[in-house]
Amino acid sequence: LAQAFVMKPAVLESKLASVGTEPAEDKVVIALGQTDGTFAYTSTANNGFWCEANGNVGNWGDTAPVYVEFSGLTMTYGHRKGVSVAGQKYMLKPTLIYTRNGVQYKATIVLNMQF
């Protein structure tokens, strides 16, 4: 990711805003790509996102089987037993967005999960 944004890892981490922050100049924010091409920024998990089966942001409960969470640049992901369906595939698109001189640069991580 540091190479994608042309910066050293320590610099990237120093520019990282907390999950829930909207894009801002000279900051790297974490968002969740939605199926309609937009991004969700509001955290619904522990510094991350609970996700619906289609990969869109959701809330913890009976309709959000998977999640992705962040601690700095460390990403954790998993599923909620009893809500996730054995054998079903889930795709999440956590995205880091860096804004510089008013231009947004995006690095998308595609998580394909199956339990």
Segments from the language model and where they lie:
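Context-gated lysine
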Residues: 8, 15, 27, 80-81, ...
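Residue-level detector of solvent-exposed, low-hydrophobicity positions
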Residues: 56-57, 97, 112
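Extracellular/luminal low-complexity segments enriched in Ser/Thr/Pro
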Residues: 69-87
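Functionally constrained cores in energy, signaling, and assembly domains
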Residues: 73, 94, 115
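A short beta-strand micro-motif common to beta-rich folds, especially ectodomain repeats
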Residues: 86-100
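C-terminal edge beta-strand
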Residues: 103-115
